[in-house]
């Protein structure tokens, strides 16, 4: 289960609208965790030093990713552009309500900086849209907490 994808679906299921930071036109190329694991094992066996862009076969803008997830899970919400500072503030409030850190400022800047997209060929084969269709009935039903998955729930965020 991917936290970002699950929580986009959660927000679409539970909030009256979905906000994207800025214009939402920054891109992502999500890779399925099993594809990433297989890639790591394959490269570990080779013993070479290589740099691989671990990306999946589909490219989305953030706005389109939210729209596609909503369509697949059967939830239509307005997708609205919000100033980054407002989006961060709303994320902070929702984070407090769910007992998590919804998004950090560096994560938001990286996302908006188009850092999750390259021109490399995909390293994974599993399409996010296919995976989402397979999990549409359970995706986003429950919030997935980043902090609950950590043994030390404060250490990674103390310097942010």
Model-derived features with residue positions:
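Flexible, glycine-rich beta-alpha linker
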Residues: 1-9, 26-27, 60
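Short, solvent-exposed polar/charged micro-motifs at secondary-structure junctions
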Residues: 1-2, 30, 88-93
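Short, glycine/charged-enriched secondary-structure capping and boundary segments
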Residues: 3-12, 34, 67-69, 96, ...
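Hydrophobic alpha-helical segments typical of transmembrane helices
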Residues: 4-7, 107, 127
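A conserved pocket-lining segment of Rossmann-fold NAD(P)-dependent short-chain dehydrogenase/reductase
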Residues: 10-31, 35, 39-48, 53-55
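Residue-level signal for threonine
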Residues: 21, 104-107
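Mid/C-terminal beta-alpha module of Rossmann-like enzyme folds, strongest
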Residues: 39-104, 114-160
């Amino acid at each position: 289960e991917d936290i970002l994808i699950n929580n986009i679906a959660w927000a679409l299921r539970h909030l009256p609208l979905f906000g994207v930071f800025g214009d939402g036109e920054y891109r992502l190329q999500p890779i399925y965790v099993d594809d990433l694991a297989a890639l790591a094992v394959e490269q570990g066996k080779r013993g070479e030093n290589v740099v691989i862009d671990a990306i999946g076969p589909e490219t989305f803008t953030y706005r389109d990713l939210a729209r596609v997830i909503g369509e697949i899970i059967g939830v239509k919400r307005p997708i609205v552009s919000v100033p980054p500072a407002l989006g961060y503030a709303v994320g902070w409030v929702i984070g407090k309500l769910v007992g998590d850190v919804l998004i950090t400022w560096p994560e938001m800047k990286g996302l908006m900086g188009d850092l999750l997209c390259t021109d490399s060929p995909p390293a994974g084969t599993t399409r996010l849209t296919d995976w989402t269709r397979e999990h549409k009935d359970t995706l986003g039903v429950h919030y997935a907490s980043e902090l609950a998955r950590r043994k030390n729930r404060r250490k990674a965020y103390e310097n942010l």
